[in-house]
Amino acid sequence: MTTLTLNTSLLSSRRILAAFSGGLDSTVLLHQLVLWRERHPDVTLRAIHIHHGLSPHADSWVRHCETVCERWQVPLVVKRVTLADNGLGIEAHAREARYRAFAQTLLPGEVLATAQHLDDQCETFLLALKRGSGPAGLSAMGERSPFAGTLLLRPLLRETRKTLEQWAVHHGLCWIEDESNQDDAYDRNFLRLRALPLLQQRWPHFPAAVARSATLCAEQERLLDELLASDLTDCITTEGTLRLSPLMSMSDVRRAAILRRWLAMRNAPMPSRDALERIWQEVALARDDASPCLRFGDHEIRRYQSQLWWIKSVAGQHETTVAWPVWQTPLALPAGLGTVQLVPGGELRRPREEESVSIRFKAPGLLHIVGRHGGRKLKKIWQEQGIPPWRRDTTPLLFYGETLIAAAGVFVTREGAAEDKEGVSLVWHA
């Protein structure tokens, strides 16, 4: 049994990062990729192991993966992740953290390879069916999909778990067993341990038939993508928001399809039918004077200026002040708002020696900004500049002492304008 079972037609890239948990599936994947590398010396192969910290055996799994990778001469990256509660359940938490770590680890020109197989595909389809998903959700997983500016490949997707076991036994491979895989309280484990064995006992080719249905659903989705491409282009702005006016005259079915595709473009979770109805009724059709907001995990859908926005939830920083004692170096902002820095060359004056520098998120009184006559309150300036309400208390305001100098990327005050060529710019990396 030496013929590779992975789909080598996917492996056009010569730089591969393999997801390696140390379990059966990923061990077979990595082993076959090592053999592929032997046949193609120009291939560069790395592995990544995610330490979730959920199991008391997690540290020993790291050591196992290090031993395997050392034996196979595969550089291994170990990433430790922290699972934050986003309301989606432990399985979704772990997956989100895992794929975020993958994205952060990928090098330019590298593709990600994961070890999902035919039985996984069947489980994914049935879970989507349980949620009442449409063709998009029932498309399950593709062998190739866009990911983090590159590709995510699933070279074993046509193979069954049984064939992977046969490969592993034939080649004397060692792998770890995650005890959580035996807990049928998890939906996927329930399917694998209890439901699918019964279905396969009755219909041995059930997983393959399900995979064919998933492929047909995917084809229908691609056709819809083609048919709706023009509508989608008309609806989406350069900022990635969704214009509401074109949707008003669409049928319910067409509008829902546009909403789904827009959310997919924003990397949002696939919404249920009820969720789409709530987006339309509670956000899109809310009163004109309302500021509607619908939470989805750690993101929100909001409406502003007759557009829908998909944004990350951030707590308001209205009362926050961040001192910036060494303004020549970047400053980290709270609540994951990124960093700011003052760089040479720009329209802001430098702070005087006696002036303390800070970042705040509110400013009292009347403000006089460059390019405007008269004074205005900050709220009025935000409105004139078209700054959405949720950004108004999270946009960094630069102060020298008690004097407002600038709002990052929005305006400069007259008191903050440079008087010579030695000015600086306030750069915000959100």
Swiss-Prot record:
GO biological process, one term: tRNA modification
GO molecular function: ATP binding; tRNA(Ile)-lysidine synthase activity
Bridged cysteine pairs (disulfide): none
Cellular location(s): Cytoplasm
Keywords: ATP-binding, Cytoplasm, Ligase, Nucleotide-binding, tRNA processing
Catalytic activity reported: cytidine(34) in tRNA(Ile2) + L-lysine + ATP = lysidine(34) in tRNA(Ile2) + AMP + diphosphate + H(+)
Top-rank taxon, per record: Bacteria
First-level EC class: ligase
Coiled-coil segments on the chain, per record: none
CDD domains given in the database record: TilS_N
Annotated NCBIfam families: lysidine_TilS_C, lysidine_TilS_N, PRK10660.1
Family note: Belongs to the tRNA(Ile)-lysidine synthase family.
Record's function text: Ligates lysine onto the cytidine present at position 34 of the AUA codon-specific tRNA(Ile) that contains the anticodon CAU, in an ATP-dependent manner. Cytidine is converted to lysidine, thus changing the amino acid specificity of the tRNA from methionine to isoleucine.
UniProt protein name: tRNA(Ile)-lysidine synthase
